[in-house]
């Protein structure tokens, strides 16, 4: 039985990844900051199949606890997903975000290096980053390949870029088998409504309940690249198996869609008679107007390809919330 360690297994993507690994017969150890997640994405049987390590990975400043975790899990593959993922929250507390999004990853990689020297542990490691690392580029530059210069405009993007820099430096300097991602927008059942697409779905569901004719929305011209969470999980598994160590990969659909188009599709799929109206309070002045990725490298190196559409994302999320 193959063994995997997932940091942030209690998160949105972490639960879907754990679910998939359990179904494939992996022995899964998952870290959870706020406790074992409620039954939902994971069934009760899937929950029980996972060895949970509950606690705050930022609490310890030495490598002891992280090395002990690696000793218990003895992973062949590590998926480092733990971190702060909501851009405004990171902006409000960048010091904590730096420790969470960068410090934890550094300690994890240093612990792997120490365990390799001590007992020969040599796992494949996936470090998950963000398309926010790219920052702002002109519309005609889309879709962005991995060779595009990274110039993040948010503290969140900056922490993820720092995480990638340290991870790839560890791969070059110490030969750790690390692959990093620049993951674009992804969604699906279980995604929190603080993020755009699930927030739109939640507002339309509320309009169906109340009979509201209009709903608030931010900038409808912003263009983003969406993947179904199940395609994201497939990409992460493909990269653990076939990604090239020391390299970064876009995880994306390669297609851009405006927020207005997403909102219109949510309404169309719901069948609710409602329309969105722009609310100035929801506008983010620092937003990157267009962010679309080129997935050629991921597809070529691993054979991965997206299988789910934006309509699938909306339908799955809508029905899961019913």
Please place each PLM-identified region on the residue numbering.
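Amphipathic terminal alpha-helices
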Residues: 2-3, 310-322
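N-terminal Rossmann NAD(P)H-binding glycine-rich loop of SDR-like oxidoreductase domains
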Residues: 4-24
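Conserved glycine-rich Rossmann-like NAD(P)H-binding loop of the short-chain dehydrogenase/reductase
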Residues: 26-37
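Rossmann-fold cofactor-recognition segment
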Residues: 46-61
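NAD(P)H-binding glycine-rich loop region in Rossmannoid oxidoreductase-like domains
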Residues: 57-100
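Catalytic helix-loop patch of NAD(P)-dependent Rossmann-fold dehydrogenases
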Residues: 92-110, 121-124, 132-180
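C-terminal "lid/loop" region of Rossmann-like NAD(P)-dependent oxidoreductases
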Residues: 214-215, 219, 248-249, 257-264, ...
């Amino acid at each position: 039985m193959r063994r995997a360690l997932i940091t942030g297994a209690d998160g949105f993507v972490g639960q879907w990844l754990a679910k998939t690994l359990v179904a494939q017969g992996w022995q899964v150890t998952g870290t959870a900051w706020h406790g074992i997640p409620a039954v939902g994405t994971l069934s009760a049987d899937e929950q029980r199949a996972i060895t949970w390590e509950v606690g705050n990975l930022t609490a310890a400043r030495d490598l002891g606890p992280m090395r002990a975790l690696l000793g218990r899990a003895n992973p062949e593959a590590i998926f480092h997903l733990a971190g702060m993922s909501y851009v405004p929250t990171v902006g409000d507390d960048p010091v904590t975000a730096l420790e969470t999004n960068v410090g934890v990853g550094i300690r994890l990689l240093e612990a792997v290096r120490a365990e390799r020297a001590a007992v020969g542990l040599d796992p494949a490691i996936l470090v998950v980053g963000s398309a926010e690392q790219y920052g702002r580029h002109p519309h005609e530059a889309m879709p962005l390949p991995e060779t595009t210069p990274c110039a993040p405009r948010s503290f969140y993007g900056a922490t993820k870029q720092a995480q990638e820099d340290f991870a790839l430096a560890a791969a070059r300097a110490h030969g750790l088998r690390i692959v990093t991602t620049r993951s674009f927008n992804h969604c699906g059942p279980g995604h929190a409504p603080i993020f755009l697409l699930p927030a739109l779905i939640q507002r339309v569901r509320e309009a169906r309940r109340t009979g509201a004719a209009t709903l608030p929305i931010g900038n409808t011209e912003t263009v983003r690249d969406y993947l179904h969470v199940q395609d994201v999980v497939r990409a992460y598994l493909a990269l653990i198996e076939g990604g090239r160590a020391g390299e970064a990969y876009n995880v994306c659909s390669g297609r851009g869609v405006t927020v207005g188009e997403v909102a219109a599709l949510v309404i169309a799929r719901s069948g609710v008679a409602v329309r969105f109206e722009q609310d100035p309070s929801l506008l983010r002045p620092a937003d990157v107007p267009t962010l679309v990725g080129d997935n050629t490298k991921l597809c070529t190196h691993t054979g991965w390809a997206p299988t789910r559409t934006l309509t699938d994302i909306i339908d799955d999320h809508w029905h899961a919330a019913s």
